[in-house]
Amino acid sequence: MTLRLRIATFNLMTLDDRRELRPSLEERIPILRPQLVRLDADILCLQEVYGQHERGKKIRLSALSRLLENTPYEGYRRVTTIDPATREVSERHNLVILSRYDILEHDQYLHEYAPAPCYKKVTALPEESEAMPITWQRPILHAKVGLPNGMVVDVINLHLKSRRPTNIQGHRLPDKSWKTASGWAEGVFISSMKRIGQALETRILIGRLFDEDPYSLIAVCGDFNEELDEVSIEALRGDVENTGNMNLAMRVLVPTERNVPEPARYSFLHNGKGKMLDHILVSRTMLAYFRGTEVHNELLHDTSMVFPERIFYPESDHAPVIAHFELPEKRIKRQTEEGGE
């Protein structure tokens, strides 16, 4: 007998219950809930889960709880990122990991391994007098999930900074367009710094997991806002072709979507072009049990085409991605655990 394990990632696109949102949460739930059920996930990583205020209470993820009602995920273990300042969930862009199996421990990382770099904007108006820290807002969420066979999977949930340019003082017009191309270019540059900085911090975390156990079962999931051949994901993967060091071969992370035929390999549509922005990267030990990937993109809408009055579709603008594994019934002992090297 083998243990089936399905790991999924899904950016829910601004999951919130604010009254001014169109479509409303009530309109979105009947659309999103069947999508979640179809995933049939044992571990589910979610992005863009918003927090809700209740009078006299802490911010809660009540919109997510409503979405999960009457689904298998309603009873799953749940861990989330929190705002370091308030120690509560944030109002925006929370990460969530749901698990059928026990979550043995969890943590989040925000500038713990990669301090914020300092940078002085070159196009800002008025001119900046000194370099300022470039921080990224979204933490890394890490959970150790204990499987029934005694094996432990390190699950990392990520939402990397988008390509949307960071604001540059003095370079935006009232209609939010850019006054200058150079201001836009610097905004894109700073956003790239944030995205690659998040990837660097994640890669340092991955290195520490491998230091603890060279055979770690690792799955890095989420909305990376980049395709496979771009810098942030190359930093996460750590390919031997880039490091030039064969001794690091066991520390490479492998993209699971590569077994999806290229015409169907996209999780986001923009201007008629499909892009694979959502990924599940796994360690080589995890790859041994990998059986296939699904990308549920049948109902994706093109994000450049919205209703005339800017009322958006109830579906997310990202497709969920699922990786399927079959693990042994019992935990396999490695040579190092038996006293030999």
Which positions does each model-derived feature cover?
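N-terminal, active-site-proximal structural segment of metallo-dependent hydrolase catalytic domains
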Residues: 1-95, 175-180, 215-217, 306-319, ...
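Active-site-proximal beta-strand elements of phosphoester/diester hydrolases
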Residues: 4-17, 109, 152-161, 180-188
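Stable alpha-helical elements in mature extracytoplasmic
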Residues: 28, 32, 60-63, 195-198, ...
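Metal-dependent phosphoester-hydrolase catalytic domains
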Residues: 90, 101-109, 113-125, 129, ...
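A solvent-exposed, charged loop/short amphipathic helix patch at secondary-structure junctions
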Residues: 166-192
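A long, amphipathic alpha-helix that forms part
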Residues: 185-214
